[in-house]
């Protein structure tokens, strides 16, 4: 059913990717209640900090309660844009369960062109059941960082729910622990939750980032 299967969502196509368009699109989604923004698109032609990156960082500054996640490039070289925005949660992919502790064969790595660590986290993104084409009920099995990013963003949504309902102490609602989290806090808790993956050079690193997000490390999740 997905990581945050009870959540509501808003979605839009991307008619162009100018700074103004991207900023305004994020604001539009914020205005209808969206707080965790997942994006499975990018520009593989450059590693530079671009106007799109500026739009993400400006939005994250202006709307501090929002968290913006981006799938990193599937190329196995340096991360591209706009996942290299300072405030973006850049997401790479692992294999699917039961091999979720293994890096997928695709996905870029840091550092960014200005020497910041990316990606931040990994999530399952290989052999993922998804919607297909041809009919309204079609399904397909797909792979890519585009599949991993929604899983990481949904994990952030679960963290947000626990914080807003005061569940962070023991998993039960408690008004004494209710907070309205910032996007930066959601991002930080996802990174803090991470567990090391098999092989590779360990974490944190330019290949793994802070490694695979695992929200059970920061949330008192119910059993079963």
Set out the residue ranges of the language-model regions.
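Acidic glycine-/aspartate-rich tracts in secreted/extracellular proteins
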Residues: 15-16, 95-98, 126, 195-198
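Secreted peptidase-domain scaffold signal
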Residues: 168-170, 177, 181, 201-224
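Active-site neighborhood of phospho(di)ester-bond hydrolases with catalytic His/Asp-centered motifs
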Residues: 38-40, 68-73, 91
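Catalytic metal-binding/acid-base residues of hydrolase active sites
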Residues: 42-44, 72-77, 96-97, 127
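Sec-exported extracytoplasmic/periplasmic mature domains
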Residues: 42, 57, 61-64, 96, ...
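Structural detector of well-ordered beta-strand residues that form the stable sheet scaffold
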Residues: 10, 67-69, 129
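Extracellular S/T/G-rich loop segment that most often corresponds to the catalytic His/Ser-adjacent loop
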Residues: 80-161
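Subtilisin-like serine protease catalytic core
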Residues: 1-21, 32-36, 45-49, 62-65, ...
